[in-house]
From Swiss-Prot:
Keywords: Coiled coil, Endoplasmic reticulum, Membrane, mRNA transport, RNA-binding, Transport. Residues 279-358 are annotated as: Disordered. Residues 343-352 have a biased composition (Basic residues). It is found in: Endoplasmic reticulum membrane. Residues 39-118, 181-215 form a coiled coil. This is SWI5-dependent HO expression protein 3. Pfam families: SHE3 (PF17078). The gene is SHE3. GO terms for biological process: endoplasmic reticulum inheritance; mRNA transport.
């Protein structure tokens, strides 16, 4: 009995008799219970079937993998067989070629044996004839060699005679050259003496020019001018750093002048040399005056300048300083590019010129 039929029965029973509704409900409950039990049984069967399906699928996968591996192995085996077959065919072809070559070689050997047997007697006669021809050719070569050797001896004798004549001519020429060489040496000595005289004159002119340049440098007193320049440079740089301003291009160009930098470096080098020679020759004196220390600070451009200037430092160019500094430098003729520092005393005053001219 289906559910629709039950509903129809219910509808008919409601019209006819409502008392049988309870029975119908109980009947429906029993039907529902039966359907649930059947549903549960079907679900359990379905789960079992699904599990069986999974196992079957796994087995199928394994079988497919094994089949693929077997196919791969079969392909490899077929490839190996094909290679072996190719090799066998190649070997068979090589055997056929070798058999044909062997047959040809046998035929050639047989023909050569026949030729050797036929021409064995004639070959000895031909060899004897060729040997006799070689002997006659050798005899002719020996005779031609003897003739050539005799002609060479005659030519060598004529060459020896010519060589002896050339030696005699060479000796006469050497005697003439010796006379001209003595004359050239005499002329060379005269030229050397004249050259030495001109060198002495040039050296005297260089020394006079050097002394004049040193005198002018001492009169100008470049050390004080350099000190004033360094002091002005320091003040300008200090002013620019304090006011956080940039110096004009013209002033910066004057500060970066390579000539002034070269003078500064040379004064520093002279001061170092002066300190070394003074430390070697003069013992340290604790009673050194402040004026001499100030003079050394003025001469050294690398010293730290202070705004307070001593009386010796603040004097204008042309005014002499009280300390007297001597620098002993030797002048070498081989290095004529640098002129050493000299000391020129004018009366009771002494000045030190540390200018290096090129």
């Amino acid at each position: 009995m289906s559910l629709e039929n039950a509903v129809r029965v219910v509808s008919t029973d409601e019209k006819g008799n409502q008392a049988s509704s309870t029975k119908l409900i109980e009947l429906l409950h029993s039907r529902v219970d039966a359907l649930t039990t059947t549903n549960i049984e079907l679900t359990t069967k379905l789960q079992e079937l699904l599990g069986n399906l999974d196992t079957v699928q796994q087995r199928e996968r394994k079988l497919k993998e094994s089949a693929a591996s077997l196919r791969h192995e079969g392909d490899n085996v077929t490839l190996m067989l094909n290679r072996k077959e190719r090799k066998l065919t190649e070997v068979k072809e090589a055997i056929v070629e070798l058999t044909t070559k062997l047959g040809e070689a046998k035929e050639v050997n047989h023909s050569l044996k026949q030729k050797f047997e036929d021409e064995g007697l004639t070959s000895e006669e031909s060899l004897r004839e060729s040997i006799s021809e070689v002997k006659t050719e050798y005899d002719t070569l020996v005779k031609s060699h003897e003739i050539y050797e005799s002609s060479n001896d005659i030519q060598c004798k004529s060459l020896e005679d010519r060589f002896s004549q050339a030696l005699l001519i060479h000796g006469e020429n050497m005697k003439a050259l010796d006379g001209t060489a003595e004359q050239i040496l005499a002329n060379n000595s005269e030229l050397v003496s004249q050259l030495r005289a001109t060198e002495n004159k040039a050296e005297s002119a260089r020394t006079s020019i050097r002394n004049a340049s040193i005198d002018t440098a001492a009169k100008v007193d470049l050390e004080k001018w350099l000190f004033l320049y360094k002091e002005a440079q320091r003040i300008c740089e200090e002013f620019a750093s304090k006011t956080d301003t940039k110096l004009p291009d013209e002033l910066q160009a004057i500060i970066d002048d390579p000539v002034l930098k070269e003078l500064d470096a040379r004064f520093a080098l002279d001061e170092i040399q002066y300190g070394k020679t003074r430390n070697k020759r003069i013992p340290s004196n604790p009673l050194l005056s402040n004026s001499q220390a100030a003079a050394r600070r003025v001469a050294s451009p690398s010293a730290n300048y202070s705004p307070r200037v001593s009386s010796a430092q603040g004097s204008l160019p042309g005014i002499t300083r009280t300390p007297s500094m001597k620098v002993n430098n030797k002048f070498s003729d081989s290095n004529a590019q640098e002129v050493p520092t000299r000391l020129h005393s004018h009366g009771s005053r002494s000045k030190r010129s540390s200018m290096v001219f090129k």
